[in-house]
């Protein structure tokens, strides 16, 4: 939502750009990207390194990237609107739950809500969520200040987000009623 700040102000002749399609085209986990540079010698070294680290990306991924690139002119706007809808849905659903507070994220497609459930750390809470069929990351995996938080991705459909949030609410309600009554 914020304005783009270009790296080109530093001068293109000083730039080696590495990027992936993960965020731009929601191809997370695919590990497919590119390198751009006007420096022939640097690109020769990058090519050697890439050759020994990764033999190749599979054909299906390459065709998907090609398709995304061909439709790139309209895709980012459509995707941004879709992710705003998903973001609004997941943050609203989380903030409606007793003992849960969630700020609206401004960057990637993750939320990092705080859970007030006495007696449970974020790792234990993530396991409880997993047992209910919801995959998330414990906030403690992101440092000490993440304790009490969970990280959810909203890269799935709105319908799946709703189903997942129903399950999260079931876990939260059960744990809060059990832990607060003791």
Residue ranges and their predicted role:
Residues 1-182:
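PLP-dependent class I/II
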């Amino acid at each position: 939502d914020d304005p783009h700040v270009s790296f080109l102000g530093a001068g293109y002749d000083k730039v080696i750009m590495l990027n992936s399609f993960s965020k731009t085209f929601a191809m997370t986990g695919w590990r497919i990207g590119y390198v751009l540079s006007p420096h022939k010698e640097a690109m020769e070294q990058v090519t050697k390194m890439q050759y020994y680290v990764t033999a190749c990306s599979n054909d299906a991924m390459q065709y998907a990237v090609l398709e995304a690139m061909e439709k790139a002119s309209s895709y980012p706007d459509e995707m941004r609107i879709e992710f705003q809808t998903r973001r609004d849905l997941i943050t609203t659903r989380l903030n409606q739950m007793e003992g849960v507070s969630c700020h609206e994220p401004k960057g990637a497609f993750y939320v990092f809500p705080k859970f007030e459930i006495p007696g449970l750390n974020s790792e234990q809470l993530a396991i409880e969520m997993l047992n209910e069929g919801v995959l998330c990351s414990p906030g403690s995996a992101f440092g000490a200040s993440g304790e009490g938080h969970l990280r959810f991705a909203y890269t799935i459909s709105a319908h799946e987000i709703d189903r997942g949030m129903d399950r999260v609410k079931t876990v939260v309600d059960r744990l809060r009623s059990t832990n607060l009554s003791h």
